[in-house]
Amino acid sequence: MYPQGKSEGLKGEFDNTADKTDDDIMTKMLEQYAGVVGEEIIGHLRQLAEPLNGMRVVHINSTREGGGVAEILHRLIPLKKELGLNAIWEVVSGDAPFYQCTKKMHNAIQGDREDISEELYAHYELINAQNHERLEPVLSEADVVIIHDPQPAALLKHYPERKGKWIWRCHVDASNPHRPVWRYLRKHVIGYDAAIYSLPAFAQPMDKPLYIVPPSIDPLSEKNVSLPDEEIERVRATYDIDPERPVICQVSRFDRFKDPVGVIEAYRLAKKFHPDLQLILAGGGAADDPEGEEVFKEVETAAADDPDVHLLMLPPDAHRTINALQRIADIVLQKSLKEGFGLTVTEALWKGKPVIGGNVGGIRIQVVNHTTGFLVSSPEGAALRIRYLLTHSKRMAAMSRNAKAFVTENYLLTRHLREYLALMVAIISGSRNRIELTRGS
C-alpha cells in the first residue's frame, strides 16, 4: 500500500519538464507532431486556422489539475495559440458545497438517482454568479466561449446580450440522465448556441446544433511519450513490482463509477489460476471531486494488505509515473460502470496494451472484442479475459499491434484540434452551406 502523496518526490526524478512552463514545452510543437502524423495533417490544421486568426476563444472548466478535461486543455490551448488564435483558459473556483452539488450533477447526468436540494442549487447559482463577476472582462469580449461540463454552465445567464458564440461541451454520457436533475441543468444549457458531445449516443436532444467531437490523447505529453527503459525500471523498483511476474493495472480517479473494488475482485479470481499475478491500482483525486479520499479508503479495505496489490494515490502531476506504470503492465483494465469517453483506455492502447474494459460509454468504441481487447460486464468476466490473455501470448502480441494502430488513426490530439477548428469555422460562418478556406502552405 502507498499512502496519499507517496509519489510527490518522483516528479523531479522522473519528469524532466518539471521546471518548464506549458509555453516552453509547446514551442513549435506543431512541427514536432509532423513526426507522428505527417506534414500533410499539419498543413490541414494551418489551413483551417487561417480564417480564425486573432479570434478570442475562451475555455472554462473547474480544475487545472486532475481528470481528462484539464489534460486536454493543457495541450489544446498552446496549440491554438501557435496557430494564431487568441486562446485563453479560465477556471471557475468554488467551495465544498459547490463541488458537492456539481459532483451530484455529474453522477445524475450519468444516470444515478441523486437528490439535490433547492438550497444546493441556489448555492451552485451563487458560485457561478461570483465567478461571472471575476470573469466578466474576459467573457464579454470573447468571440467563442466553450464551457466544459455542468460546473460553469450557469455562467451563460449573466450574458443575455453577449458578443460571441457560447458552446456547452459535455464530456460525460448523458444518454440516460436522472430526469429531475437534467431538467434543472437543461434550463441552463438550452440557451447555448451549440453543444458538443463525445459520441452520438451520449447526446440529449436540444433545439440547437449538436456536434460530435471525441476527445483525444497527446502522443508527445509526459503521460504518453516514449520513456527510456531505465526510467521505467526505476518506477518499477520504487513500487516494488516484480519484473518476473505478470502485472495487470488500472489507472483512474478513485471513483465508484470506475469500480476499483470490482477490479480487486477480478484480480483475486484470476489469481486462483495465476498465483504470481500482481495488480496496480493507480490514481488520484481531482480538485472538483470531493469523494476521492472516501473511495480510496474503501479500496484499501478491499485490498486487505495483499502484498501483490500495489495501491497508489498519486498527485495530479505524476504523468511520467503513470506512463511508466501503464508500460509495466501486461494488461490494462478500465472496468468502469459508467464512463464518459475513457481516455485512460486510449492511453493504454497507444502504449500497445490490450485493454479489458467495462461495456459502457466510450470504452465500447475503443475496445474492439478480440482486436484491441475485451469488453466485460462483471468481475467474473474480467477475470476470465485476464486468464485468457495470460495464456495466449501470440493473441496478446497481435492485440498490442492493433491497439496502437487504432489510436494513431482515430484518437490523437491533432484530430481533436482539427475538429475544434472546423467547428469554429462553421459557427462563425453562420448558415452558409459552402465555406472557403485559404490554401495552406
PLM regions: where:
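A conserved catalytic-core segment of Leloir-type glycosyltransferases
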Residues: 11-56, 74-141, 204, 213-219
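Conserved donor-binding/catalytic core segment of Leloir-type glycosyltransferases
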Residues: 237-258, 264, 280
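Nucleotide-activated donor-binding/catalytic signature segment of Leloir-type glycosyltransferases, i.e.
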Residues: 283, 287, 292-324
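Short alpha-helical segment that forms part of, or immediately flanks, the ligand-binding pocket
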Residues: 323, 346-350, 364-365, 371
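Aromatic "clamp/platform" in nucleotide-sugar-dependent glycosyltransferases that forms part
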Residues: 337
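Short hydrophobic beta-strand element within catalytic cores of glycosyltransferases
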Residues: 354-357, 367
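Conserved acidic donor-binding segment of nucleotide-sugar-dependent glycosyltransferases
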Residues: 369-370, 374-380, 388-393
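A short, well-ordered alpha-helix in the C-terminal region of glycosyltransferases
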Residues: 388, 395-409, 416-422
